[in-house]
Amino acid sequence: MSTQTRSGGGGGGGHARNQKKSNASNSGGGGTGHHDGVSHAAAAGKKGGQDASKTDKPEKAQPKATTEQLRIAQITNSTTEDPQINEKVLLLLTMTQRSEEEVCCALNECDYDLEAAANFLIEELPQGAFAKYEKKRKNKAANNTADGAAGDGDWADGNGNADRREKSRNRSSNRGGTRGSSDSRGWRGRETRENERNQRESREPWSGQNAGQDRGDDRANDNYRGQRNGGGRSGPGGGGRGGGFVSRSGRGGGRMGGRTGGPRGDRGSGGPGGAYGSGRGGNANEDHHEVELWDNTIAQNAEKQQQAHDDAWGDWNNEEYEGSLKDSKVFTTSNLATQSAANVVSGTGASVTAVPAAAGTEISAPPGLEHQLVQQGSHLEESSSSGPAAVTPPATLSGSATTPLLQYSAAVSNPPPQLQSQGTQSGAGTGASAAAGGGAGSTPSSFVSASPDTFSSAASAAATLVHQAQKQQQLQQQTTPIKPSATLSVEQSQYFNSLASQGVSPGSVPVQSAPAGYAQNPVAAYSQTSTSVGVSQYPNTYANVFASGTAAGAGTAEQSQQQPQIRRARVKLPPPSKIPASAVEMPGDNALNNIGYLDVQFGALDFGTDDGFEPLPEKVGSGFSIDGQQQQQQPDDYQSKSQQQQQVTLAAGLQSSQISDALNAAGYTSRSTSQQQQGVSSAVNATIDQLTKSDPYGQTGGSGNAYQNAYQSSGASKTASGFPTTAPGGYSSSTYANVQSSVANSYQQQGYGSYQPSSYQQQAGSGAQSGTGAVSGGGGTATQNIPVGGSSSQNSTSGNASSAYLTSGYSTPQSAYQSSQSVYGNTGLSNSSGFSGSASNASSQYANFSASAKLKDATTASSAAHYDSVSTSSGVSSNSGSTGNGGVVSGQTGANQAAVSNNNSVSGSSSVSNVTAGVASGNVAGVGGGVSQSGVSSGVGVPGGSASSVGVNVNNNSSSASSVGAATVAQTATGTTAAVLASLTNKNTSSSNSSGSGGSAATTTGNASGQGAGASTGGVGSSSGAGGAGSGGGSGSGLVPTNIQMVSQYIQTGLPYYQQPVYSYEELQMMQQRVPHVQGYYDLNYPPASLGAGRDNLGSVTYSAMNDGRFARTDNNSSPVGNVSSTMSQQAGSSAPMLNVPYAYFYGGNVMPGSFQYGTPAIYPQIPAANTASGQQFPKPSYSAGYGSTSYDTLSQTTQDYSKGGYSSSVNQQSKTQTVSNQSQAGTGSDLTSSMYGKGHVALNKVNSYEKQSFHSGTPPPFNMPNTQTAGGTSAQPYGMYLPMPAAGHHNMIHQPIHQVHSELPLQVVVGGGTESHVLIHGNVNGPQVTYHRIWQTEPVQCQNQLVAAHCNNFEPNIDCCVHDNNNDLSFFAD
């Protein structure tokens, strides 16, 4: 293959081909004749060489292109390319799906013979041969030189950025051309010099490789190229890419591939320079096997490289890592499992062997190789043996397979010491330690540990990873499919690869293995995992995933994806330090969605660490999946055991055990059940209360433990356990609560935890409640765990959970509110205070909200309460408080309220509350007591059944039954009312607790009580079930209660984990500094203009005139001027004035009232100026004066902006003209002529418009939309999407409590038939049932005749079923 450098640039293409023919010729000459090219090559080579020779390699020294060269460049660089060539290029691009460089190169190579080029591309040119790996960085020097080189205008970029190259690639500079084009020559020479410098620099060490030939010498020699060509591969002649441009040809340097092949950065890396010299033109060498192997492994390379070069690894090179990456190899597992490592390796090995000198010669594991590395370690060994140094280190690796792999990698990477020391050792060490900790990981770790020194290089690490991954894979395959790994995205996998290369992976591997260890040493495993995780798990996980990816199916996917990447990774690997190992790889979207996944550490807690946090590994998925899943699984096993034990315990005390379960689920299980139980039972209430309030994070005590454990293990186990434990409620509550907890745990835990937990907790709580005792109490603990164990019940949650968060802060307030609420009871006040109560619940409010939401429905009975519940704040707190009223629950009025409270409570308390309510005082007391748990617990406080019932929630321990009991009690006490409320509650909250308890309560009563803990737990199960069901069932705890308003109207879906008011209070606090506080609803958020008010002025002033239409480019800004001051706008850009959302926008009850809109934060303060806000942009007076006002003149005059041009005159003049519309009048005749508006017109004179802002066609802006053309922007303030105001869901608040004959009835539908006699109320307590009475009068005609008869009005009498709701005085027809 001719090694010619493919350069014939564009037009020169043909020549280039010729050049190709002559190695010596410098293709650079481009078509002009390779002779020139040669001479150029020689000259350039010499120049470059000389420069290169100069070790100092002063760029300055680099010769500028000679006039001759420039001329040649000009000649060869035909900017206008033969259209046919473009067509051909496009055609080839389409046919071969190769990169433009490759296609252009091929065409050039093939003298623009389309068919030949296609064959060349497909048959000969390896995939990615031309992938541009280049350090953009080099361009700096290149640019400098380029700048120096006049002829290179195009190439001024020096490297001719790939982009540039591509652009200039016009055929003239088709990539090949660029390379070849003499023009490129100039730049190339520069670049070459630069590269040489870089290479020489890095390469200085390599100079020996240069074969003693100084690059400069080589360059100097025309032969240089020739050598490069001939020697090219071996010959340092390859000499830098510069030489490379020619020499690249060495590898077929013509094959741009070589040049491109090596990432330019590679070239730049100089190390590659050595590579050049040493092998295959090092660059290419480095970059691809292809150079080295290109001839014998082209097919393989093509496969490998197809994607390998697709990524712009060049970006890595952008890092200005100086130094040779040559040695660092990252072997990423690739899909080519099919290729036997041996084959690839052997091929590679052969090449390597052929060029043993370049131990560093990149031999990357072929894509398939990684998998097979272990298996075919022997081959690897062989190949690695060819690689001199590396072999030994691998030897240290414990596994023979590993050894080969490692050796292979080591040999390949033969990592430069720095890399070795940097990434691998630490990584490996970590891995080793981790592995050691991992236990299972130990195997990998042992080999890792053995290897850390050995693998110093990233490559080693990668190899290690691979090996580990394989082992891991086996382990995982045995232990668990690594779903998460499957989820890794290519990016992630690559990321992992890089991590692996950087040594992160080794640590991670152990982590993976840890799961096995985990099972063995659950605690250790967790800690290890946690620790490791904290340290490396997360990335490790990725790394694992990456590594295991190989092992795991995910790995496979990765591999397939990565397969191509192998080279890239290898070449690209930036020095570990360059790019943060943990760079910015974000977890997959799933992860992003889960705050919990962020490895944010609040306090000492690592949320992110516990994958477990999310029982759903899927979400954790890529990042955590391995750990998460394994943990989960183990936790499951673990849990199973624990659970089993606990279950045994359960028998003893369901609640405790449940709690334990919940805890177990939490993953506490590992902790002694007894602890958990203890903590749960004894500690739960107090602890939870305490925890929620005082020790949210520490959450010491059994609960605390549960909390943490749950947090830690909960993800997996919790979910598993808690989930199952609480199943119904448990799921959402546990899961969420736990998860939430874990997510929220520390974080949300409070803020949201309470909230969420509240709501979820309620649910969880419900679950917990459901889990009730266990969950609620214990589970609750678990759940509460986060929010507040207690919170398990919403109540507690509210009280506690909320408390937990807010409660801590707000609890008191909550209490206060609650008290108020209690006082108010159901009162909306409570509610609103509920809000505050919520506040107390803070989240609670959300929780309440959730609960409330649920509650609302449920709470139909007590509107206020319901509402309150909605606010829930009262709900929880209130609830308790309400509950107090609730005491009334008995069915007294209080009952309603209580019910409401329940609703609120429902969330946690609610049932308790209800129950508590049952015992009004008890309830309140309960609340106190409940407080511990939560208000719910308060319920506990409630003596007797109430207490029990409440107790259940609260105590859980006391008796699960309690909670249910409570509900039951409530029902019992209240009887129907309670039941109804409970039902409602259930319905609403689904509060699961409360409803569960409530609903269940009725049911549960016996159950809850009867079951006592069991029931609760289970019962909570039942109530939970009910409640849980309620939670599930009611609103579906997760769901927003039907009636409840969203906290944010936006949030229609499952309640968010945390309430999402438009602004959280914190945000508001932050916002307010910038945001003027409440303003008139529609007031602009920013000061209008000095003009102030005029609506026209308003927007317009602020904006420059409605330039928006033409996005006034102000000067530098293309975006429409915003409501930013002109100066600002120019810089800041502008946006339409933010108008508040129209009132129709519905803010949920919790949401800020619309009046409290946050204007767009005045980030850019509008500059109120004496002149218009626009300041210089717009003459201040102009608007006020009139669009045309003279003031404009002045202003514009003053304002340099306007002064610019016709505009200035037109604008200025406009003012003179004073008729804005015809600004042009004064402006210039031209203005008029140009447009009726005059140039000023936006549309008419875009140019001017852009230059200056003038009124939009001088017409006053419409309305106060600042930008005439742009409708008033919606305010930047994030207000939810505009939601037409939905009718508020039925809210208890809205209706006075429905007076129901039977409290059981959720609703009474009165069906009127004929006369009152027909009214039927369906008394079935179990469910809302409406009995419709057929209304057809027996004598419809008669009825018609009897127009007077009320029941016989023409309308109803003839309807089959007319249902008349007396309460609402509504009639409706039912089928």
Swiss-Prot record:
Under which name does UniProt file this protein?
Answer: Protein lingerer
Cell compartments where the protein resides: Cytoplasm
- Indicate where the modification Phosphoserine is found in the sequence: 324, 672, 674
Q: What keywords are annotated for this sequence in UniProt?
A: Behavior, Cytoplasm, Phosphoprotein
Q: Which regions are flagged for Basic and acidic residues bias?
A: 53-62, 185-204
Q: Briefly state the protein's biological role.
A: Acts in the nervous system to mediate the control of copulatory organs during courtship.
Concerning SUPFAM superfamilies, the annotation shows: UBA-like
Low complexity composition bias: residue spans:
142-161, 173-184, 442-453, 629-646, 750-767, 789-801, 869-882, 987-1008
Where does the record place Polar residues bias? 374-387, 395-412, 1265-1277
Report, as the record phrases it, the tissue specificity of this protein.
At stage 11, expression is restricted to the neuroblasts, predominant in the central nervous system (CNS), including the brain and ventral nerve cord, and in the PNS. Later embryonic expression is seen in the gonads. Late third instar larvae show expression in the CNS, imaginal disks (including genital, eye-antennal, leg, wing and haltere disks), and gonads. In the larval brain, it is expressed in all of the glial cells and in clusters of neurons that projected contralaterally.
The record's note on what follows loss of this gene reads: Male flies exhibit abnormal copulation. They fail to successfully withdraw their genitalia upon termination of copulation so end up 'stuck' to the female, tugging to separate. There is also a 'non-copulating' behavioral phenotype. There are no morphological defects in the male genitalia. Females can mate successfully but have reduced fertility. Complete loss of lig function results in lethality during early pupal stages.
Modified positions (Phosphotyrosine) in chain numbering: 321
List, alphabetically, the InterPro entries matched: TC-DDR_regulator, UBA-like_sf, UBAP2/Lig
Composition-biased stretches, type Gly residues, lie in: 228-282, 426-441, 768-781, 1009-1036
The UniProt record lists the UBA domain at 84-124
What are its GO biological-process terms?
copulation; dorsal/ventral axis specification, ovarian follicular epithelium; male mating behavior; negative regulation of imaginal disc growth; negative regulation of receptor signaling pathway via JAK-STAT; positive regulation of hippo signaling; regulation of gene expression
Q: Pfam families given for it? A: UBAP2-Lig
Where in the sequence is Phosphothreonine found? 673
Q: Name one GO cellular component term.
A: nucleus
Region Disordered: which residues? 1-69, 142-286, 374-453, 613-646, 750-801, 869-894, 987-1036, 1203-1234, 1251-1277
